[in-house]
Amino acid sequence: MADVKVQSESESSDSHPLVDYQSLPPYPPPHPPVEVEENQPKTSPTPPPPHWMRYPPVLMPQMMYAPPPPMPFSPYHQYPNHHHFHHQSRGNKHQNAFNGENKTIWVGDLQNWMDEAYLNSAFTSAEEREIVSLKVIRNKHNGSSEGYGFVEFESHDVADKVLQEFNGAPMPNTDQPFRLNWASFSTGEKRLENNGPDLSIFVGDLAPDVSDALLHETFSEKYPSVKAAKVVLDANTGRSKGYGFVRFGDENERTKAMTEMNGVKCSSRAMRIGPATPRKTNGYQQQGGYMPSGAFTRSEGDTINTTIFVGGLDSSVTDEDLKQPFSEFGEIVSVKIPVGKGCGFVQFVNRPNAEEALEKLNGTVIGKQTVRLSWGRNPANKQPRDKYGNQWVDPYYGGQFYNGYGYMVPQPDPRMYPAAPYYPMYGGHQQQVS
């Protein structure tokens, strides 16, 4: 077998920024029927119209039925190939059908003793798997496994075959099955230029049978500049979540597609097209949330705070689900998700790592919803309490606290939605009406 690149424990996860697709159950069930008295005729009540809901979804996570149009899917934020080692394989190398095809598989439910050597042997067969690199994510304090890792293959075809063959199959020397999925970042791809535009669009209402290739073909037939297409899959079932993203190389074609392709059928359903927000904008203006410039100015002057508030979480997101995308950016001290609050807190060891995570993940999709990030308050930074026992807060912290953490809820910018009149505002939060 050809040489395999195995990353050492000392390598920071920053060199290989990899994130898994978030696994989530289906949407919450509809409202139960309302009991009526026997002497009254029984009817089948329907849930109240969305505009009757006057409470912020952060306080009522059970009402958050559908996410707002998500951000550009993470595979489009491509990263430098620091440790990409090619080796020869039998036959011709597979040429990607189009740019952006993923070659990296996320491996979950790893036991503490499962290291890179174990993964290498587990995925190697007589056919000689074309493995490029391996990495088990470890805790920097004690070196223990975080329970997941990544395996990059030479081509998308090989990775796809491994995913189909091994997912759910028994792991060697254990009685547990493999838990595999596509990684959200492909380590073999080149990162987009920081100053380059991210010309992506959101595509919703996709039929269950729509694949990456079909979505790409649907748009590339009319727009030659299409570079990539991605259908978001559920990590547990492997089925489509009903939406995806298409990235263009030409801004004019992207603009035309926003209008011309809206309502066009892909497979058996008409597509719903929406804008995907750029990765980087002034004042952190993001689709699904808008961070006032004042909050960003305050955070720039605070070089000690390393805690990030994460708003807009759905109730099925776990601590581990929240930790995985953030762990790409550096060492994490703690992750907390208050029960029933629709939010969480992630505390980093280093300030620069927290700044990068806030910039890159604000407005991305974690679970089934777009999250809104802002600076929280480190538990060590105590604030005086008012006469009601509440922590003193100023406009930056927004009056929200949990277990010593303070946070603000960024306000959405309705102008970012092409159908703003049809997206009611609940308590200052943008929520999609399905």
From Swiss-Prot:
Top-level lineage group: Eukaryota
Function, as annotated: Heterogeneous nuclear ribonucleoprotein (hnRNP)-protein binding the poly(A) tail of mRNA and probably involved in some steps of pre-mRNA maturation.
Subunit-level organization: Interacts with the poly(A) tail of mRNA in nucleus.
Protein name stated in the entry: Polyadenylate-binding protein RBP47C'
One annotated GO molecular function: mRNA binding
Chief location category: nucleus
Native species: Arabidopsis thaliana (Mouse-ear cress)
Keyword set, alphabetical order: mRNA processing, Nucleus, Repeat, RNA-binding
One GO cellular component term noted in the UniProt record for this chain: nucleus
Family annotation (SUPFAM superfamilies): RNA-binding domain, RBD (SSF54928)
Gene that this sequence comes from: RBP47C'
RRM domain ranges (all copies): 103-185, 199-278, 306-378
Pfam families listed in its UniProt record: RRM_1
Family: Belongs to the polyadenylate-binding RBP47 family.
PANTHER family, alphabetized: POLYADENYLATE-BINDING PROTEIN RBP47C-RELATED, TRNA SELENOCYSTEINE 1-ASSOCIATED PROTEIN 1-RELATED-RELATED
UniProt region (Disordered), positions on chain: 1-50
InterPro entries for this protein: Nucleotide-bd_a/b_plait_sf (IPR012677), RBD_domain_sf (IPR035979), RBM42_RBP45_47-like (IPR050825), RRM_dom (IPR000504)
Gene Ontology terms describing biological process: cellular response to heat; mRNA processing
Localization, UniProt: Nucleus; Cytoplasmic granule
